[in-house]
Amino acid sequence: MNTKTLKTLGAIVAAVTAVSLSGCASSAAEETQSGSESKPTIVATTNVWADITGQVAGQFFDVTALISDTSVDPHSYEASAREQLAISEADLFVVNGGGYDDFALTLASATETEMFNVYDVLEATELEGGDEHAGESGDEHAEESADEHADESSDEHADESADEHGDEHDGSDHVWYSLHSVEQTAISLAQKLGELQPENAQYFADNADAFVSEIAVLEQKLEALSAMDGHYFEAHPLAAMLFADLGFENLTPEGYAEAEEAGLEPSARILADSQALISSGQLQFLAVNAQGTSPVLESLKKLAEESGVPVLEFDELLPEGSNYQEWMESKLDSIAAIR
């Protein structure tokens, strides 16, 4: 074999080796890229909690919601097999709790996925002291909210709610309508995510701080609205916590909201009292659940319109294209518009 042939063979071997190594590198790069795209996942029962969780989790988790369709009732929701699988493979399952989405508790019990129950976390936070948790976030607004607003809500308004409604269902499971509760939830979520990814704990805390700062702006708007007269008829206790924080007075005849929420017709006496109240001129607005209706409710809405009483709609789910802050601001703006 002459020198020229040896050189040619050497070049071929070198080329083949280079192509082979390049292929390995390319394959490894693709695997790395594919791996980087596969983030840990969080599943939330509703798009409200998915949005709030996503704002805290940021780039390090993919967050999805089981329920985003406003025609779906979370109280009677049934998850598909695919959704059950997604929950079982998730790193965290965020549920509202408090009896609102009980289907989620059944789903969670069938998996090993850790559950973040907002209602239970808030109860534990109140027992431990909201100011302690807010202080951990390192944000001035969070501390103010935990100290000042918690006192207002717990001392002044909670007493009113307890006095007026007693043991009745007062909408306390609709905790996303309490700005203070949502602040505390964001802080607690940041702490939980920091446990799952300690290396990103500060990132989550910073995101929670930014979120709480935006909620603090809404609380200032809420505080300004609390000076207005707020006598209202509550066709559904959906936004009861928001109205309590505003210091508004619920004049709804006892038993109406409970019957409406349960899908039952109120008694003739309750209906007559409701009609008389709406026609009396005492109300600033009629509050209804935009996702539910009934012949009785439609008749009361018509009566309200004829009596010059504004009808304000409140929702259980985020409208498409809005985040939580924008959604709550729109609700406060709708209340401000009736002054």
Predicted segments, located by residue:
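Extracytoplasmic metal-acquisition and chelation regions
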Residues: N2-R339
